[in-house]
Amino acid sequence: MCALDRRERPLNSQSVNKYILNVQNIYRNSPVPVCVRNKNRKILYANGAFIELFSREDKPLSGESYIRLQVEIFLSSLELECQALGHGSAFCRRFNFHGEIYQIRMENVSFYNDESVVLWQINPFPDYPFFALNQSGSNTNTSDKLTIWNDLSPGTLVVFSFYMLGVGHATIARELGITDRASEDRIKPVKRKIKEFFEHV
């Protein structure tokens, strides 16, 4: 059997309580929002950063990403996906919350007593200014190049990253949950800006 096959990974020999204590020791004072939930979606542990993140007041008129319940429903659906993948599985996904983009990492951990938990770790997703640097007037060439990227939206940068790796628009659209046309439209301003830049070089 392949060494990377999750079916062959040994279950965690420690108890759930011991596992939670280990997580608590690592993340108690961490700025990274972290929680551990059981298969019934009950929070067994959440650090202060997690509690603070999800204590923001709802703003119903600002869209679904400003309503905590809507965001929690989306994250719970990801958690079910992680549980379905089985012990040892882990993945990262992006989500919007209160106008900010975050990346969540979920990991499924199973134990010998037939218990399992999902570890959540949340980070702010990199946003523009893209490759932000402290520029001095002495290096105008570098500053001009960075301006190309700073003017692009995060959504355009994500599509462009896939596009530069040779991924087709149909695949990009499927992975990002957008239409093929939207993927193509996001590339057009990048091509235009690059063309304008090199015409002046």
UniProtKB/Swiss-Prot annotation:
Q: What is its main location?
A: cytoplasm
InterPro entries in the cross-refs: PAS-like_dom_sf (IPR035965), PAS_fold (IPR013767), TraJ_R1 (IPR016384)
Q: Does the keyword Transcription apply?
A: yes
One Pfam family name is: PAS
Q: Which UniProt keywords apply?
A: Activator, Conjugation, Cytoplasm, Plasmid, Transcription, Transcription regulation
Q: What is this protein called?
A: Protein TraJ
Instruction: Name the GO cellular-component terms.
Output: cytoplasm
GO BP terms, alphabetized: regulation of DNA-templated transcription
Keyword Transcription listed: yes
Q: Where in the cell is it found?
A: Cytoplasm
Q: Which residues cross the membrane?
A: none
- Give the species this sequence originates from: Escherichia coli
Coiled-coil regions, chain positions: none
Give the domain of life. Answer: Bacteria
Function, as annotated, reads:
This protein is essential for positively regulating the expression of transfer genes that are involved in the conjugal transfer of DNA between bacterial cells.
